């Protein structure tokens, strides 16, 4: 439809010269809106983390910043590449609708790999936040330097995979892509950048794909083990920890638990669609439009949950909006209570 093509060109002006059918236009509009909202929310959260965090939130705000910066960069990668991802047998075919298509094959494919590795790092960051809370409750000391080192260690694995994908063999040959897709995509020759790679020849790409999908299982296991241990420790040390410390810990754990549910509506649907398309139960062309919008939901939900649960951030937003709330607390409580109950 011409009107959808016009809307897509307005929202994403760098795609004005790109061939797009109706489904492509809807995809570009959706991705642009989701990533723009996610980018602005994470930019706001990063401002709050840097300038509006109380001193006693310092170790934890490093983990918040780690997740927020990851989501910011993810939004940039997603909106500049806008990849449609198709899978057929041992091949992965990516059609690029974003402006990265004009920067060559290597930049285009690495932008897609970058999206996957940033998604993985955001999950790892949530896990590290839960580990932080467990160790801070159990051993009572967790410095800012320790938090930074832990974030660097957590990012090492995604970055290592990302870097190892830099020499992947890709093909932009129209004849080869046409043979692989076998009529799956109409007007394939009209797209400016279509890249195909044979996954079976690249272990690093297989590891990255499995880490983003199956890797959530061990991450969930670690998070919920830490969650169980935190509640167990708080029950066993009632005489050691003050009521405010116990309340803060429970509220933080509640916030992290909510954030851990986000992948269930962002990553898992994309993974399920990918598996079903491999088995032939789902049309691969339809699946190609779902993966990036699904992953982008976490880019929006994470900052919303954080701002809602961290009281200083929430109060600042309410003050900015000139709103009053009945859950305002005294200045003495401000110094001890960080997380707001739902």
Curated annotation (Swiss-Prot):
Cellular compartments annotated: Membrane
Broad class of where this protein is predominantly found: membrane
Keyword Ribosomal protein annotated: no
Membrane-topology descriptor: Multi-pass membrane protein
Gene3D superfamilies: Rhodopsin 7-helix transmembrane proteins
Family assignment from sequence similarity: Belongs to the nematode receptor-like protein srd family.
Membrane-spanning ranges: 26-46, 62-82, 112-132, 148-168, 205-225, 261-281, 287-307
Name of the protein this chain belongs to: Serpentine receptor class delta-33
UniProt cross-references to InterPro entries, sorted A to Z: 7TM_GPCR_serpentine_rcpt_Srd, GPCR_Rhodpsn_7TM, Nematode_rcpt-like_delta
Top-rank taxon, per record: Eukaryota
Pfam families noted in UniProt: 7TM_GPCR_Srd (PF10317)
Transmembrane helix listed as a keyword: yes
UniProt keywords, alphabetically: Membrane, Transmembrane, Transmembrane helix
GO cellular component, one term: membrane
């Amino acid at each position: 439809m011409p009107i959808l093509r016009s809307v897509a060109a307005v929202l994403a002006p760098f795609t004005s010269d790109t061939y797009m059918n109706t489904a492509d236009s809807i995809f570009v509009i959706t991705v642009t809106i989701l990533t723009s909202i996610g980018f602005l929310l994470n930019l706001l959260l990063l401002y709050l983390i840097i300038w509006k965090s109380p001193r006693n939130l310092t170790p934890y705000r490093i983990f918040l910043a780690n997740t927020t910066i990851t989501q910011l960069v993810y939004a940039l990668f997603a909106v500049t590449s806008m990849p449609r991802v198709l899978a057929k047998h041992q091949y992965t075919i990516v059609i690029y609708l974003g402006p990265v298509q004009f920067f060559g094959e290597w930049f285009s494919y690495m932008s897609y790999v970058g999206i996957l590795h940033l998604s993985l790092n955001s999950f790892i960051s949530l896990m590290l936040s839960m580990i932080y809370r467990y160790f801070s409750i159990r051993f009572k000391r967790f410095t800012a330097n320790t938090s930074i080192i832990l974030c660097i260690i957590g990012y090492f694995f995604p970055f290592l995979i990302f870097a190892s994908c830099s020499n992947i063999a890709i093909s932009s040959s129209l004849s080869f892509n046409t043979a692989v897709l076998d009529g799956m995509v109409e007007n394939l020759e009209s797209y400016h950048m279509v890249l195909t790679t044979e996954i079976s020849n690249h272990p690093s790409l297989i590891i990255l794909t499995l880490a983003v999908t199956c890797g959530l299982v061990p991450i969930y296991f670690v998070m919920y083990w830490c969650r169980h241990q935190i509640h167990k420790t708080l029950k066993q040390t009632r005489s050691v920890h003050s009521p405010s410390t116990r309340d803060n810990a429970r509220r933080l754990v509640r916030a992290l638990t909510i954030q851990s549910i986000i992948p269930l509506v962002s990553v898992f649907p994309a993974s399920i669609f990918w598996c079903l398309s491999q088995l032939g139960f789902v049309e691969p062309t339809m699946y190609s439009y779902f993966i990036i919008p699904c992953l982008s939901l976490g880019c929006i939900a994470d900052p919303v949950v954080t701002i809602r649960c961290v009281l200083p951030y929430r109060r600042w937003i309410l003050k900015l909006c000139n709103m009053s709330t009945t859950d305002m607390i005294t200045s003495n409580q401000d110094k001890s209570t960080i997380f707001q109950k739902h």
